[in-house]
């Protein structure tokens, strides 16, 4: 299995958010039935420390903005948000600005909007699972299987979590469409 262990990715995001000063987080999940996204949120709170605080924001950008703004208004002590997807992160950023809150924003996955938010400082980091590796590594495994007496790796091959932030966004963005 090649991929990103979502619970571990969330945990690493929570640990980093905690190290960056977050004390009261909120996880925005656009697909509450999607166990991978729930794992991201549960992992975030495992790393951050504290009880799970996850809301279903739907996949509709207007709903994401409205529900995020409502959550921030209802609990001004929220100082960290993890968005479980890139479009959620962009909508959360707008809600944070609309409410006038100061909130540490972290994301999952890459998009043009997330790239811009990392460059501007609106988002602290995103977790990149390197989708190209998820497609490339199985080819290598199949080649080895066919040329090495049917031998397979003994464990999962993680492609993430990897952090993208202001320190490496330009390098990562330059690889978009080539190696990422």
Positions of PLM-derived features:
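Short beta-strand segments enriched in small/hydrophobic residues
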Residues: 24-32
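CN hydrolase (nitrilase-like) catalytic-core segments centered on the catalytic cysteine
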Residues: 116-124
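Short, solvent-exposed amphipathic alpha-helices that sit
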Residues: 9-13, 32-52, 67, 91, ...
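Conserved acidic residues
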Residues: 23, 79, 124
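Hydrophobic alpha-helical segments within soluble ligand-binding/sensing domains
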Residues: 1-25, 62-65, 111-114, 129-149
């Amino acid at each position: 299995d090649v991929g990103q262990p979502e619970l571990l990715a969330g945990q690493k995001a929570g640990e980093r958010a905690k190290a960056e000063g977050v004390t009261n987080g909120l996880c925005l999940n656009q697909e509450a039935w999607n166990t991978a996204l729930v794992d991201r949120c549960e992992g975030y709170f495992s790393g951050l420390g504290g009880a799970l605080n996850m809301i279903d924001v739907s996949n509709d950008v207007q709903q994401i903005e409205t529900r995020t703004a409502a959550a921030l208004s209802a609990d001004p002590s929220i100082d960290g948000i993890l968005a479980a997807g890139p479009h959620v992160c962009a909508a959360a950023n707008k809600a944070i600005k609309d409410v006038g809150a100061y909130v540490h924003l972290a994301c999952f996955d890459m998009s043009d909007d997330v790239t811009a938010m990392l460059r501007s400082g609106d988002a602290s980091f995103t977790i990149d699972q390197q989708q190209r590796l998820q497609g490339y590594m199985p080819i290598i495994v199949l080649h080895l299987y066919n040329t090495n007496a049917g031998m397979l790796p003994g464990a999962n091959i993680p492609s993430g979590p990897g952090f993208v932030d202001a320190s490496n966004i330009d390098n990562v963005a330059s690889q978009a469409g080539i190696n990422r």
